[in-house]
Amino acid sequence: MASITGALILAAGKGTRMHSDKPKVLQSILGEPMLRFVYDALEPLFGGNLWTVIGHKADMVREAFKGEDHRFVVQEKQLGTGHALQAAWGELKAAGLDRVVVVNGDTPLLPTSTVATFLKEAMDADVAFMTLTLPDPGAYGRVVRHNRRVVAIVEAKDYDETLYGPEPDEINAGIYCLRMDAVEKLLPRLTNANKSGEYYITDLVGLAVAERMDVIGVECGQDPNLLGVNDPAELIRSEALVRARIALNWIEKRVLIHAPETVRISPRAVLEPGAEIYGPCEIYGASRIARAAVVHSHCWLRDAVVAEGATVHPFSHVEKAEIGPDCVVGPYARLRPGAVMEEGARVGNFVEMKKARLCKGAKANHLTYLGDAEVGPGANIGAGTITCNYDGVHKHKTVIGEGAFIGSNSALVAPVTIGAGSLVGAGSVITKDVPDDSLAIARGRQTTLPRRRNS
């Protein structure tokens, strides 16, 4: 019978060194919670056999992954990594696991391939863990060996050279593979007799050695991908490495990225071969950029769809909006959630759309607000046009028919419909529906008087 291996992510800590109100695992990297990168690394290996221990501001962590299929275990009191494992043990055992891989939730650089290799090396051990060798071990737990055999892991603040000898530069990377039936008898023996007063998962190593179990430390050199994030400086360094990794991945897939060192792309974004991106630029969330689409510099996109042949000019802001084939956006345009541009539509400088649709070939080239509106095919919206969609209590819809022409500086007070082929004179305030093929003018008649001069 094949053995079953699962994974447990430790994500309950406060992350006090971040000096943030957010839990550490929710700190942002390229617009995504740090924890998402750990999920991305582990899900290909463990699928549904993946649990996350949460504790500090647990509801905030749940909310960040709302709608996603994750298994959470709550550590009511944050009493250390060993206590977190104890809190999750019942669920791990109920799942029938033979082994569990334990990973810290603050390792956003962790590659799937590294975990897969570690699993192969750890399969014959009762307790296995990954180690790094660093010139400056800092606050990481030290790996104590005797004749190359692992003896213990000792936290930096508890290390005593009189007991363990000269301080080593080999540190614990915080990734473990534990055989369930072997470790189960050790868990109750964890104590908090240390300077932090916490139950350390690292103490399982010393206990396993004392029981003559098979314990191995898998040496990984100086691999920076295994290091955790503990403070803002480390977060920034990790984000820079992730950003470079993602940009290189898309370049290798034939996406043309100019100044890639200035382009920030979410791990959930999808770029098709032949897309062209100019930095600096930010592409977040589940954005999709199609082939032959161009996104120019200083643009900000989140959950945006940019279809084939579309162009987004500089300084445009696009969020939860759809830009159709061969559309043109900007410069300095803002598409808010619910904005949809159909094929060949154009939105120019200082135009804002929200819950509005520009149908095929429609244009709003200058200084316009389109909110809760539908603009028919081929319609033209003049500069300074405003759809007045909010009466102070409710939002109302504006419908502009096919081929309609709205003159500059017009206000369309919703709910209102402008019929197909109709023309609204410049400067009008339209409060009533306009039939098809009509001319509507709603403004004061011009009066011209002789100029009076001072005597």
UniProtKB/Swiss-Prot annotation:
It is an enzyme of class 2 (transferase). Homotrimer. It comes from Nitratidesulfovibrio vulgaris (strain DSM 19637 / Miyazaki F). GO terms for cellular component: cytoplasm; membrane. This is Bifunctional protein GlmU. The lineage of its organism: Bacteria, Pseudomonadati, Thermodesulfobacteriota, Desulfovibrionia, Desulfovibrionales. Pathway: Nucleotide-sugar biosynthesis; UDP-N-acetyl-alpha-D-glucosamine biosynthesis; N-acetyl-alpha-D-glucosamine 1-phosphate from alpha-D-glucosamine 6-phosphate (route II): step 2/2; Nucleotide-sugar biosynthesis; UDP-N-acetyl-alpha-D-glucosamine biosynthesis; UDP-N-acetyl-alpha-D-glucosamine from N-acetyl-alpha-D-glucosamine 1-phosphate: step 1/1; Bacterial outer membrane biogenesis; LPS lipid A biosynthesis. The keyword Repeat applies. Its EC number is 2.7.7.23, 2.3.1.157. The gene is glmU. Its main location: cytoplasm.
